[in-house]
Amino acid sequence: MSVGIVEEQSVTFETDLRLESGRILGPITLAYETYGRLNADRSNAILVAHAWTGNAHLAGKYSEDDPKPGWWDAIVGPGRLLDTDRWFVICSNVIGSCYGSTGPASVNPKTGKRYNLSFPVITVRDMVRAQALLLDHLGIERLLTVLGGSMGGMQALEWATQFPDRVRSAIALATTSRPSPQAISLNAVARWAIFNDPSWKKGEYRKNPKDGLALARGIGHITFLSDESMWQKFGRRYSARDGLFDFFGQFEVERYLTYNGYNFVDRFDTNSFLYLAKALDLYDVAWGYESLEDAFSRVTAPIQFFAFTSDWLYPPYQTEEMATTLRALGKEAEYHLIPSAYGHDAFLLEHETFAPMVRDFLARVERG
């Protein structure tokens, strides 16, 4: 059952947040949504962390005529994987984004103008520290679990390492301890597309740049899919509207990338895209530690990992390495490799496959 009609909330923290870069950001506004009810001892809270261009709208609709529900609606609600009859589910928009939380598109209170490129570089660790402020605001000392895929999985890892006393468990899907040179290079090409769009104006645009961001998003969509899923979804089908020997004729996969690229321009800020891409590239759970082992030595909660066979952005071996490292340290870690043709996006689509394992894991966590 769906959670039904929901409402976005926000909170502004007047206290400054010291970032990993050493710079200070404040005040900070966080947009968030909650589903279900917090129990009397505040022990039933689950935090869901979104991916790169996600938002706090995890589930439900804002109105009856809303065309589609939140981005992971299928797993949230009464009787669903994240059962809102039992648990209090929270999702917040990360700092640096453009869906209600403080980011480069926000107005700098010191200047009265948009931050744009004066916004400080942020990290995934900074995002999690901001989320900790939200939990303090909600009166939640400890989470039952923190769950996320891709960049959301990175946030789950940061919670487990940076705030081990505040999480009873963590669930990380389709993620990595640090992006590979290949992943960084793909983001670099996406950045070039934006930097070389004259309408970007070095971040000082009034109207969201169109062509550069659309191309950057198209590159992203390629990384989210897989060879197998592209064959299944598009094959080598040519657009029926174009002549085969029309120079500007397009294959169906080209139309897909064009449509999704330009559609994205209408809903996401270009500078936010760049800042979050930078945060992804900089991510290393062992940052500030001597090694991955040193970072994971801080973990006290069990962690459940999921990787997907066709994910070439964050390949399974990267996930397995984390689980193996934790086990070698005597920590509790599960690793599940899910067969899937959906590529990196599988974490959003294969919920029926991994749901039984997550249910079993959370039941064990609750039993202690």
Swiss-Prot record:
Keyword vocabulary terms for this entry:
Acyltransferase, Amino-acid biosynthesis, Cytoplasm, Methionine biosynthesis, Transferase
**One Pfam family here:** Abhydrolase_1
Q: Name one GO biological process term.
A: methionine biosynthetic process
Q: Which residues bind substrate?
A: R217, D345
- The record places domain AB hydrolase-1 at 44-350
- Catalytic residues (UniProt): S150 (nucleophile), D311, H344
Q: Which top-level enzyme class is recorded in the Swiss-Prot or TrEMBL entry? A: transferase
List the catalytic activities from the record.
Answer: L-homoserine + acetyl-CoA = O-acetyl-L-homoserine + CoA
Alphabetical list of InterPro entries matching this protein: AB_hydrolase_1, AB_hydrolase_fold, HAT_MetX-like
The record's section on Gene3D superfamilies has: 1.10.1740.110, alpha/beta hydrolase
Q: What is its main location?
A: cytoplasm
EC number(s) from the headed UniProt entry? 2.3.1.31
Q: Where in the cell is it found?
A: Cytoplasm
Gene Ontology molecular functions: homoserine O-acetyltransferase activity
Q: In which pathway does it act?
A: Amino-acid biosynthesis; L-methionine biosynthesis via de novo pathway; O-acetyl-L-homoserine from L-homoserine: step 1/1
Recorded GO cellular component terms are: cytoplasm
Q: What does this protein do?
A: Transfers an acetyl group from acetyl-CoA to L-homoserine, forming acetyl-L-homoserine.
Q: How does it assemble?
A: Homodimer.
Which family is this sequence assigned to?
Belongs to the AB hydrolase superfamily. MetX family.
Entry-linked PANTHER family = HOMOSERINE O-ACETYLTRANSFERASE (PTHR32268:SF11)
| Name recorded for this polypeptide | Homoserine O-acetyltransferase
